[in-house]
Amino acid sequence: MCIRDRSKGISRLTMVVEGDDETLQQMTKQLNKLFNVLGVVDFTNLAAVERELMLLKVSSKEDTRSNILDIVQIFRAKVVDVSDMALTLEVVGDPGKLVALEKLLEPYGILEIARTGKVALKRSSGVNTEMLKINNYSLEI
């Protein structure tokens, strides 16, 4: 996903790739060789905020609408369009959250799905919440 950074007059591109350390190092080297690339940041071991957006259109008849809206509320999703036969939802979160919502809504009939893929920014606080989850710590602010 490519997003223009208004403050610097540059664009930011987020890529999610899988591979061993050698493959990722080679990819980083190749990207850094490109003329218009100012830098490459590997977020693998950094404290970062990661999110993904999903738009989902689900069949919603009168007798199922309240059940669907209950699920939507639990996932903190937003209803962005309504018709007699369908609801269009917007949900933001980690991929696990999006997949869980999709699975719960499948029985109602998913008509369309669009997903952005991950976007990420380094955490200013430096706190790696993923490591807190792994170590079963809770963070209270």
Predicted region positions:
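Helix-adjacent hinge/juxtasegments
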Residues: 19-59
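A short, glycine/Asx- and small/polar-enriched loop/turn
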Residues: 7-12, 50-52
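Generic non-transmembrane alpha-helical segments
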Residues: 27-30, 34, 67, 71, ...
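Short, low-order "capping/linker" segments at domain edges
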Residues: 49-71, 92-107, 123-141
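Short, small-residue-biased leader/transition segments that mark boundaries at the very start
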Residues: 1-2
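A generic structural motif
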Residues: 9-18, 86-91
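Conserved short beta-strand edge segments in small beta-sheet-based binding/regulatory domains
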Residues: 35-47, 77-84, 109-123
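Strongly charged, low-complexity linkers/loops
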Residues: 67-90
